[in-house]
Amino acid sequence: MKIKYLFYIGVATLALSGCNDGFLERAPEAINDKTFWNTTGDLETYANQFYSYLPGGVTSIADGESDNQVPNSIPQFFWNQLSTPAEAASWCNWSKGGWQPIRLVNYFLTHYQTVSGKESEINQYVAEVRFFKAMQYAGLMRTFGDIPWLDKDLGTGDTDILYGPKLKRYEVMDKIIEEFDFAIQWLPEKPATGRIGKDVARQLKARTCLHEGTYYKYHTELGWADKADRLLKMAADETDAIMATGKYEIYNTGHPEKDYYDVFVMEDKTNLKEAILPVTYLDGKRKHGMSRTLAEANTGFSKDFVESYLCLNGKPITGNDQYKGDTNMKDETTDRDPRLKQTILTWDFPTRVTVATNDSTYIEKEEDFISQYCLTGYKSIKYFIPTDKAFEANNNTYDGIAYRYAETLLINAEAKAELGTITQADLNKTINVLRDRAGMPHLTLEVGFTDPNWPAWGYSLTPLLQEIRRERRIELAGEG
């Protein structure tokens, strides 16, 4: 039976809903700092509001600001359209929406000390709140680089702090790590249904460390290359810790032609071991409309992305006898990594299924891939169910995945490859587990080929790192 996943949403005024009976019994006019901050139930109630910031876990069109996907309208990040204004205002999330979560966290950290209870129970909720601070700051840091670090609840008179100096990006990162480490220390290994635990914090810390570690390493103009290995080691260590729990595994029933697709459209993901944090949707409680969104003309995958899929023999398309060319969709997807046909709309995947009559429609003309569905012709089918009921607006109840174990394995392999410590055993526990699901040949340390179409990153990469990045691009396609 599907278990309800609650996204706890509240407001900063403490007019919050939750399972704290003592809170519910208080008259609204009695809710203030003196009457609220008393029990661990109060802490839980306050922490609930931050759960709305977690990913909804049902998108496959979130790569529009990368080389992987092309939106129907040109993003402002492309074609030199983006300019930095003299004042930030609401530019690129420098706004109330970007900073309000930080204020709400700091308000909590200023007031929770009056609560009575066991240290472990109190710190569990402090850990939740500090996790969300780390998550929010990581996003702001990626967008803006150097930013202020706010660690107290501010008033209108705190102008010296509000308009104070920024910290360097790497200094902000050190602060973020402190927040993650506290969360990892105090969050439970086995959290209650719907709440975050240690592994969610480990995953997001590892993701952030890999991003920043490679950013420092390859942006040599910053002069921070000496700081990279420490972060890459953290990424490897945290994902090692997740893998060592033995709680997670890649969904694989031995059907490479459908297992990858099935992960995303599976109705109930409560017991899916690939989901570090499943996101539950229930009829009458919380639903989404991703199938309807994907059915309409929308963001498409790029030609460059589609050409990055290997052929069934584990080699790139250039000079490969298995590659049939791109005259039509059937040729282009034949004898390719099976994940390609489970990611993009093809000639043999139904665009609509009428359940009552068991009637299905398919693409009949090659030009319809572009004229009816997306400008690139490569429409996403991840998280897409073509039944007539699924097409109803906001009527989908199949679960999402906020944090996926596949990413854990990819982070682990890439971090170790960047450090130069990766072994074939590491590849077999990470990249090759993903390839086993897809029925693809294993990746070896030597790689065994050179691809003339490897991306030009602006710096040199080993063939192994190129292939690990290819695997990330394919496996996490459209997930943002």
Question: What are the roles of these predicted feature ranges?
Answer:
Residues 207, 211-213, 234-329:
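Polar, glycine-rich mid-to-C-terminal structural blocks
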Residues 39-56, 74-144, 160-174, 178-193, ...:
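Conserved, well-structured interaction surfaces
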Residues 19-62, 317, 325, 330:
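Membrane-proximal, proline-rich intrinsically disordered regions
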